[in-house]
Amino acid sequence: MPQSTPSQEVQRVPWDNKPALKQITLRATIAGIAIGSLVLTSNFQFGLQTGWVSMMSLPSALLACAFFKNIWPLIFPNDRPFSDVENVYVQSMAVAVGTGPLAFGFVGVIPAIEKFLTNDESGGLREQGQSFTFRELLIWSTALAFFGIFFAVPLRKQVIVREKLPFPSGSATATLISVLNGTEILQEVSKSELLEMRQRRLNECPEVLQPNRDPEEADYLMNSSHSELGDYTATSQDGSSILSTGSENYRANIIILLKTFVVSSLYTMVSYFVPVIRSIPVFGKYLSNNYLWNFQPSPAYIGQGIIMGLPTVSYMLIGCFLGWGVLAPLARYKRWVPPDADVHDWEEGVQGWILWSSLSIMVADSVVAFIVVTVKSIVKFILIDDKAALLNNIIDDTFQSMLLEEERAINSSRRNTYVDGRQDTVRLVSRDNEIEVDSKHLVRYTTVISGCLVSSIICIVSIIYLFGIQVIPLYAIITALILALFLSILGIRALGETDLNPVSGIGKISQLIFAFIIPRDRPGSVLMNVVSGGIAEASAQQAGDLMQDLKTGHLLGASPRAQFCAQLIGACWSIILSSFMYLCYNKVYSIPSEQFRIPTAVVWIDCARLVTGKGLPDKALECSMILGVIFAVLSLIRNTYRDYGYGWILYIPSGVAVGVGIFNSPSFTIARFIGGWASHFWLKNHRGDLNAKTKMIVFSSGLVLGEGIFSVINMLFICLNVPHY
């Protein structure tokens, strides 16, 4: 009897036993920190330029798998195989490290306080332009690093195990990891979805319904049909296995990632020596000089547009035309701004004037969406029919037998598909049942409660140390933490249902609420407002990221406790690296500048000034109110009818996306729109190809990572005074 290879032993582990596999390892921890550091470097570049930060969970998982499949065996040939749950651990840690710039406020709150806050607005605590020291940045990051993680853990049972929110990115990452490692993935289906799967399979192969058909032939026909989850089988005429489709997809994705990374890196290097390519005046010099209508052929911005998708970038383009094609020329023509003011001037120029309209639209959209989601949740809770729930939870023998039949058909269709000796399989379970790992692999509630208390105390002590209890009183910090808890729930649910974590909107809601709590005439009210919003944003960002990763782990059978540890370790490393990178950018570059406009920071400080009673520029209030009302109504319609599946909902623009299109310069939006169109045509021409979207995300991730990581080389060139044109 032949002996099993190590990789085959991993394949044999059923889903229920996978949490017991060793996941917290030194090699996985080092890999997670390394990959996360690359993502963090990329996110800093684009966060300071446009305010855009990405989790990069899918490319992180792909890079981890590539390293441990191709490089690690050359160094340690006798080491145990890399498992899918260990891959989840690496990816979770990489996300925790990489999203530090946004979670810790280094692309918004910190530059807002440093660059724009006046001495009066800070309560006499800081001078405008006074930079934070490295020690202060470490303390600030530590204050925000942990409570969002502890807030999220108790919600896992509700949103993932019970409600089974889809978390599209987390589910896509789980599917990729399953295919790359050739292991079992959990597929939760409802009765209607199961019937659709069965009907589609039978329609594609009606011969299986013929009563006189030979059983073996019918079985072959069933296995050769395409399942709901895709067909990965490739066989020759004699039935022998030829090249594994899983391995082909893996190699193809790696090649795509490397090629796009190289192209984007080359653009970054060339843009240093020929900076004119960053801003090409394709619409003429007048529009370029007065309204910033340029084209920047940045591969990274095109990649961001691919990730965002056509609807979002279309809404941004609407905002771009509204802000820079209508409002800005109107304000200058009507002399609501000085005609000779610099277009880059956030105080006197058109850029500063249209920002108020952008802010009004985003706040109106966020507040209305928050109200609608809250009301829907309350109504849903009140109207639960216990009898109906009881009946739906009764085990239906027919349903269970159908589950087993479809599971067998799907996995049989993959019987010749191997990745390094392993086979990727599917385990179908009823969505009505709660599938959970053993309690010993869950985070203990004593850990959660003590962690919430300790992290909250760390936050309180750190904020008081940095700003003083006279400027930011104790009750304000405690209120911000309590508010952060509730807003984290909103962020998690929004991310789970729409794949979008509205952290910017959550921060604005927090600022708006604090405007009613803190007296406007209190010294330091603007600083207090910004800090409280930063606390809420950090909590929502971390809680959403962790829940997305927990969804990935749940589908693959990873240990929630191991992922929790990965998030904590990643946050600890991100504290140090984020603080260091911000210090480097601050010393090497002039911020704000045309290259690093820090638009998110401007939005933070202007929102704080708005809600604390500062006067607006001429006619900005009237314009902001009109647009705010319009987009509040649109937000009400979109969020009320979003769950009904109406096609026309897609044509109602998102206020947040429109607002982003207004405050970002046109060059950023145009490049992203090109990326959005590219993704639309790609998916349209590859309908039915389940690997098409994965390849598209890998393609775009390579573009983003290449330019982001090689921006460090450009930073080094500046430090060395390397000449350029």
UniProtKB/Swiss-Prot annotation:
The chain crosses the membrane at residues 28-48, 134-154, 254-274, 353-373, 449-469, 472-492, 564-584, 644-664, 697-717. GO terms for molecular function: oligopeptide transmembrane transporter activity. It holds the Pfam family OPT. Belongs to the oligopeptide OPT transporter family. One of its GO terms (biological process) is protein transport. InterPro entries: OPT, YSL-like. Its main location: membrane. Keywords: Membrane, Peptide transport, Protein transport, Transmembrane, Transmembrane helix, Transport. It is a multi-pass membrane protein. It comes from the Eukaryota. It is found in: Membrane. One of its GO terms (cellular component) is membrane. This is Putative oligopeptide transporter YGL114W.
